[in-house]
Protein backbone atom coordinates (compact mmCIF):
# COMPACT_ATOMS: atom_id res chain seq x y z
CA UNK A 1 0.00 0.00 0.00
CA UNK A 2 1.38 3.42 -0.94
CA UNK A 3 2.24 6.06 1.64
CA UNK A 4 -0.18 8.99 2.08
CA UNK A 5 1.04 12.08 0.28
CA UNK A 6 0.29 14.08 3.44
CA UNK A 7 0.01 12.72 6.95
CA UNK A 8 -0.59 14.91 10.00
CA UNK A 9 -0.42 13.28 13.43
CA UNK A 10 -1.38 14.98 16.68
CA UNK A 11 -0.86 18.52 15.37
CA UNK A 12 -1.04 21.22 18.06
CA UNK A 13 -0.74 24.97 17.56
CA UNK A 14 -1.26 27.81 20.04
CA UNK A 15 -0.85 31.54 19.42
CA UNK A 16 -0.30 34.27 21.96
CA UNK A 17 -3.01 36.92 22.00
CA UNK A 18 -3.75 40.00 24.06
CA UNK A 19 -7.05 38.54 25.20
CA UNK A 20 -7.44 35.86 26.50
CA UNK A 21 -3.66 35.45 26.32
CA UNK A 22 -3.41 32.17 24.42
CA UNK A 23 -5.51 30.85 21.56
CA UNK A 24 -5.29 27.12 20.99
CA UNK A 25 -5.94 26.93 17.25
CA UNK A 26 -5.27 23.25 16.56
CA UNK A 27 -5.90 20.48 19.08
CA UNK A 28 -4.44 17.09 18.19
CA UNK A 29 -5.32 17.20 14.50
CA UNK A 30 -4.87 13.96 12.55
CA UNK A 31 -5.30 13.86 8.76
CA UNK A 32 -4.09 11.79 5.83
CA UNK A 33 -4.45 12.63 2.15
CA UNK A 34 -3.86 9.72 -0.20
CA UNK A 35 -2.22 9.87 -3.64
CA UNK A 36 -4.71 11.19 -6.19
CA UNK A 37 -7.24 12.21 -3.54
CA UNK A 38 -9.01 15.59 -3.34
CA UNK A 39 -10.02 16.53 0.22
CA UNK A 40 -12.15 19.56 1.06
CA UNK A 41 -11.38 21.40 4.30
CA UNK A 42 -14.35 23.43 5.54
CA UNK A 43 -14.32 25.68 8.58
CA UNK A 44 -15.76 28.97 9.82
CA UNK A 45 -13.61 32.07 9.48
CA UNK A 46 -10.88 32.20 12.10
CA UNK A 47 -11.08 28.48 12.87
CA UNK A 48 -7.47 27.85 11.86
CA UNK A 49 -7.74 26.37 8.37
CA UNK A 50 -5.03 28.67 6.99
CA UNK A 51 -2.79 27.68 9.89
CA UNK A 52 -3.45 24.02 9.12
CA UNK A 53 -2.57 24.56 5.46
CA UNK A 54 0.62 26.44 6.36
CA UNK A 55 1.72 23.63 8.67
CA UNK A 56 0.85 21.05 6.00
CA UNK A 57 2.95 22.96 3.48
CA UNK A 58 5.92 23.44 5.84
CA UNK A 59 5.44 27.21 5.99
CA UNK A 60 4.79 26.99 9.73
CA UNK A 61 5.87 24.60 12.47
CA UNK A 62 3.45 22.94 14.91
CA UNK A 63 4.00 23.16 18.65
CA UNK A 64 3.59 19.38 18.78
CA UNK A 65 2.83 16.56 16.39
CA UNK A 66 4.29 15.18 13.19
CA UNK A 67 4.06 16.26 9.54
CA UNK A 68 4.97 13.76 6.84
CA UNK A 69 5.18 14.65 3.14
CA UNK A 70 5.35 11.64 0.81
CA UNK A 71 6.68 9.49 3.64
CA UNK A 72 9.27 12.03 4.80
CA UNK A 73 8.98 12.90 8.48
CA UNK A 74 9.66 16.63 8.75
CA UNK A 75 9.80 16.71 12.55
CA UNK A 76 12.84 18.66 13.69
CA UNK A 77 14.11 19.23 10.15
CA UNK A 78 15.97 22.49 9.51
CA UNK A 79 14.88 25.35 7.28
CA UNK A 80 16.98 24.20 4.32
CA UNK A 81 15.51 20.69 4.35
CA UNK A 82 11.97 22.02 4.77
CA UNK A 83 12.44 24.49 1.93
CA UNK A 84 13.78 21.76 -0.34
CA UNK A 85 10.80 19.47 0.29
CA UNK A 86 8.36 22.37 -0.07
CA UNK A 87 9.81 23.45 -3.41
CA UNK A 88 9.90 19.93 -4.77
CA UNK A 89 6.72 18.36 -3.41
CA UNK A 90 4.21 21.11 -2.54
CA UNK A 91 2.24 23.61 -4.63
CA UNK A 92 0.18 26.48 -3.20
CA UNK A 93 -2.86 28.39 -4.49
CA UNK A 94 -4.47 31.27 -2.60
CA UNK A 95 -7.71 33.26 -2.86
CA UNK A 96 -5.81 36.05 -4.63
CA UNK A 97 -3.62 34.94 -7.50
CA UNK A 98 -0.37 36.72 -6.46
CA UNK A 99 0.96 36.55 -10.03
CA UNK A 100 3.97 38.75 -10.76
CA UNK A 101 2.46 41.75 -12.59
CA UNK A 102 5.47 42.53 -14.78
CA UNK A 103 5.57 39.05 -16.33
CA UNK A 104 3.23 37.33 -18.78
CA UNK A 105 1.05 34.37 -17.90
CA UNK A 106 3.55 32.05 -19.56
CA UNK A 107 6.50 33.62 -17.75
CA UNK A 108 4.71 33.31 -14.39
CA UNK A 109 4.51 29.55 -14.94
CA UNK A 110 8.05 29.29 -16.31
CA UNK A 111 9.82 31.18 -13.50
CA UNK A 112 9.27 28.65 -10.67
CA UNK A 113 10.72 25.96 -12.90
CA UNK A 114 13.83 27.99 -13.69
CA UNK A 115 14.29 28.57 -9.95
CA UNK A 116 14.14 24.79 -9.51
CA UNK A 117 16.91 24.17 -12.04
CA UNK A 118 14.79 23.19 -15.05
CA UNK A 119 16.07 24.34 -18.45
CA UNK A 120 14.19 27.14 -20.18
CA UNK A 121 13.06 25.07 -23.16
CA UNK A 122 11.61 22.33 -21.00
CA UNK A 123 10.06 24.90 -18.64
CA UNK A 124 8.32 26.73 -21.48
CA UNK A 125 6.99 23.49 -22.96
CA UNK A 126 5.56 22.39 -19.62
CA UNK A 127 4.09 25.85 -18.97
CA UNK A 128 2.32 25.86 -22.34
CA UNK A 129 0.97 22.36 -21.73
CA UNK A 130 -0.45 23.38 -18.34
CA UNK A 131 -2.00 26.58 -19.70
CA UNK A 132 -3.54 24.60 -22.54
CA UNK A 133 -5.05 22.09 -20.12
CA UNK A 134 -7.02 24.85 -18.36
CA UNK A 135 -7.99 26.66 -21.55
CA UNK A 136 -5.88 29.81 -21.33
CA UNK A 137 -3.11 28.98 -23.81
CA UNK A 138 -4.37 31.83 -25.98
CA UNK A 139 -3.65 34.27 -23.15
CA UNK A 140 -0.08 33.08 -22.51
CA UNK A 141 1.47 36.33 -23.74
CA UNK A 142 -0.72 38.61 -21.61
CA UNK A 143 0.24 40.12 -18.28
CA UNK A 144 -2.04 39.55 -15.27
CA UNK A 145 -3.69 42.99 -15.53
CA UNK A 146 -5.01 42.04 -18.98
CA UNK A 147 -6.56 38.78 -17.73
CA UNK A 148 -9.98 38.25 -16.17
CA UNK A 149 -10.21 37.08 -12.56
CA UNK A 150 -10.95 33.54 -13.68
CA UNK A 151 -8.03 33.55 -16.10
CA UNK A 152 -5.68 34.89 -13.43
CA UNK A 153 -6.63 32.08 -11.07
CA UNK A 154 -6.21 29.43 -13.77
CA UNK A 155 -2.70 30.72 -14.39
CA UNK A 156 -2.09 30.60 -10.63
CA UNK A 157 -3.11 26.92 -10.65
CA UNK A 158 -0.63 26.25 -13.44
CA UNK A 159 2.12 28.06 -11.58
CA UNK A 160 1.41 25.96 -8.47
CA UNK A 161 1.81 22.78 -10.52
CA UNK A 162 4.78 24.00 -12.58
CA UNK A 163 7.29 21.84 -10.72
CA UNK A 164 5.05 18.73 -10.70
CA UNK A 165 4.48 18.64 -6.91
CA UNK A 166 2.93 15.66 -5.17
CA UNK A 167 0.65 17.81 -3.00
CA UNK A 168 -1.49 20.85 -3.83
CA UNK A 169 -2.68 23.07 -0.98
CA UNK A 170 -5.36 25.63 -1.86
CA UNK A 171 -6.82 28.28 0.45
CA UNK A 172 -10.23 29.48 -0.84
CA UNK A 173 -9.03 29.30 -4.47
CA UNK A 174 -12.40 30.44 -5.88
CA UNK A 175 -13.41 32.71 -2.99
CA UNK A 176 -12.77 35.95 -4.89
CA UNK A 177 -14.82 34.97 -7.96
CA UNK A 178 -18.50 35.23 -8.90
CA UNK A 179 -20.48 31.95 -8.76
CA UNK A 180 -20.40 31.19 -12.50
CA UNK A 181 -16.67 31.89 -12.79
CA UNK A 182 -16.05 29.98 -9.57
CA UNK A 183 -17.61 26.85 -11.07
CA UNK A 184 -15.55 27.17 -14.25
CA UNK A 185 -12.31 27.72 -12.36
CA UNK A 186 -13.04 24.81 -10.01
CA UNK A 187 -13.62 22.58 -13.04
CA UNK A 188 -10.20 23.66 -14.32
CA UNK A 189 -8.64 22.81 -10.96
CA UNK A 190 -10.25 19.36 -10.97
CA UNK A 191 -8.96 18.77 -14.51
CA UNK A 192 -5.43 19.63 -13.41
CA UNK A 193 -5.55 17.49 -10.27
CA UNK A 194 -7.12 14.48 -11.98
CA UNK A 195 -4.89 14.85 -15.01
CA UNK A 196 -1.68 14.88 -13.00
CA UNK A 197 -2.62 12.41 -10.25
CA UNK A 198 -1.43 14.60 -7.39
CA UNK A 199 -3.16 14.95 -4.02
CA UNK A 200 -5.04 18.09 -3.00
CA UNK A 201 -6.21 19.63 0.27
CA UNK A 202 -8.54 22.50 -0.56
CA UNK A 203 -10.01 24.92 1.99
CA UNK A 204 -13.34 26.35 0.89
CA UNK A 205 -16.52 27.96 2.21
CA UNK A 206 -18.40 26.70 -0.84
CA UNK A 207 -20.19 23.55 0.33
CA UNK A 208 -21.37 22.71 -3.19
CA UNK A 209 -17.79 22.64 -4.43
CA UNK A 210 -16.69 20.74 -1.33
CA UNK A 211 -19.28 18.05 -2.03
CA UNK A 212 -17.69 17.42 -5.44
CA UNK A 213 -14.42 16.32 -3.87
CA UNK A 214 -13.55 12.82 -2.70
CA UNK A 215 -13.91 13.64 0.97
CA UNK A 216 -14.90 16.52 3.24
CA UNK A 217 -13.37 17.26 6.65
CA UNK A 218 -14.48 20.01 9.00
CA UNK A 219 -12.28 22.01 11.38
CA UNK A 220 -14.10 23.32 14.44
CA UNK A 221 -12.81 24.30 17.88
CA UNK A 222 -9.36 23.17 16.82
CA UNK A 223 -10.43 19.63 16.02
CA UNK A 224 -10.92 17.88 12.70
CA UNK A 225 -13.89 15.65 11.95
CA UNK A 226 -14.94 13.75 8.84
CA UNK A 227 -18.16 14.76 7.09
CA UNK A 228 -18.06 12.26 4.24
From Swiss-Prot:
CDD domains per record: ABC_MJ0796_LolCDE_FtsE
Record's subunit section: The complex is composed of two ATP-binding proteins (LolD) and two transmembrane proteins (LolC and LolE).
Gene, per the UniProt record: lolD
Location within or outside the cell: Cell inner membrane
Lineage of the organism: Bacteria, Pseudomonadati, Pseudomonadota, Alphaproteobacteria, Rhodobacterales
One Gene Ontology MF term: ATP hydrolysis activity
One GO CC term, this protein: plasma membrane
EC number: 7.6.2.-
Annotated protein name in UniProt: Lipoprotein-releasing system ATP-binding protein LolD
GO biological process: lipoprotein localization to outer membrane; protein localization to outer membrane
Family, per entry: Belongs to the ABC transporter superfamily. Lipoprotein translocase (TC 3.A.1.125) family.
Amino acid sequence: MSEPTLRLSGIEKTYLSGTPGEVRVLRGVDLSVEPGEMVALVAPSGAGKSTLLHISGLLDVPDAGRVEIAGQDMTGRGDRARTGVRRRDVGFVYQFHHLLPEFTALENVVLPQLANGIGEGEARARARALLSRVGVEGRAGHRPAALSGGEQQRVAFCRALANAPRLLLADEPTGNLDPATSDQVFDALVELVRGTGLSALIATHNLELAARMDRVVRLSDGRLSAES
